Amino acid sequence: MTILRVCCAVLAAALCVAAASVPVSTAGQTSRVKALPDPPGTARPSPVSRPRLTPLAEGEWTDVHKTIVAKYAPDGRPGNALRTLLNIPALADSFLSFPAYLTKGSTLSPRHRALLILRTAWLLNNDYIWSEQVPAARTAGLTAADVRRVAEGPDARGWSAFEATLLRAVDQLFRNSFVNDADYKALTAEYDVHHTMDAVMTVADFLTLGSMYNALGIQPDPWNPDRIPADVPYRVVVPKREPPLTTPRVEPVSGTGLAIARTFARHPALAAARKELGYINQQMKLDARTRELVILRIGWNCQSAYEWAQHVGSFGKGREMGLPIESIARGPAAPGWSPVEQALLTAVDELYRDSTVSDRTWASLSTHLDVVTIVNALISAAQYRQVSLALNTFGVPGEPGDEPLPVIGSN
C-alpha cells in the first residue's frame, strides 16, 4: 500500500471518530474531549461590534504607511480595514496583496467573482466585505434582487445552473473545507484549471479576510451603506464531506520540490500573487512554537492531511520542537496545556467555528500576549485555513514519509 493510500485510510478513520467525543485518560481518571469543534455555520456568526485594534489615524502615518495607502487606496480614502492593518505595516502589505489580485486580476468574470465574494461575506455575517463589494457587484450587472438572492443561497429561484454550482461550492468550502466531486466536476465543466483555482482561492481568501475582520471588530465604512439583509434566515445546507482524494484534481507540474508549490505552479499568475504566507513564515514576530501550534490546530480542524504532515514534520518541525502532537488534535480541553496555549487553541477553534473570537477568549489571550502577537497568531490560523481548503480541494498529493493525521480515541 502506498504512503498516500495509508494517509487516506487513516484520515477516513479519523473522520469517522471525529464527530463524537473521545476518551482521554489523565491521573487515573477519564474525561471526554471533542476531537473536532462543531462545523462552521452551525449558527449565524456574531462579529465584534467595536474595534479591538484602533484604525491608525492619518496623523500617525509614516512614509511606510503612506506608501501602503497609495498602493491599496489610490483614491486617497483608506477604509477601516486598511487603517486597522496599518498598525502592522508588513502585515497590511502582504495581507491585502492577494485580494487585490482576486478582485482585479484573476481569470474570473466580474459577475462570478461577485457571487463568490458576496456569498462568502454572507456566510461570515461580515458587513464590511458585503458593503464594500456590493457596488462592484452592481457594476458587474447584479440587480438588487440578485444581491438579495445571494443571501438566500444556491437553492433560491433565478440562478443559472452554473451560478448555483458556484454558490454551493462556497458553502461547501466554508462548512467542509472541501468541494465534493459532483460540484467540482460541474465547476470544471465550464472552467479551465486557472478559473477553477481562482474560484477556490477567492472563497478561501475571503474567508480569511472576513473572519479576521470579524475578530478585530473592523466596522463598515460610512461611505458604503449596504448591509447584509437581516431578514434572510441563516441556513447552511451542504452534503456530508466525501472521503479524501486519492488522486490529484490539479496535477502538479513535473519536477522537484514540494507538491504544493508544483500544484500552484499550474497557475503562474495566481502563484505569483500569493505573497501573504511570506509574512507568516519570514517577517512575523511570533515564536515558532506558537506559530506551529495554531497552524497544526487549524490544519486538524480542516482535516488537511498534507498541511498536518508538513507542519508536524519537515517544514514546521512541530514534533521535533517538542509540541504534543496528539494533544493538538484533541484540542484545548486536552490535559497539559499552559493557560496561554489553551487560550490560543480556543481562539483557533472559535475563529474556525464561529468566524470570530469571543470576548472571553480575547480577554484570556490579552492577559498573556500583546495585541500584535494576538493578531499574528490569528492571522496564522486564518491564512493556513485558506491553504488547507485549497490542499483538500485540489487534492495535493502527500510527500514521501509524511506522517498521517492521528486516529484519536481508537489507538
Identify the function of each model-found stretch:
Residues 1-4:
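N-terminal secretory signal peptides that target proteins for export/translocation
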Residues 7-18:
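Bacterial N-terminal signal peptides
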Residues 19-411:
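Hydrophobic alpha-helical segments
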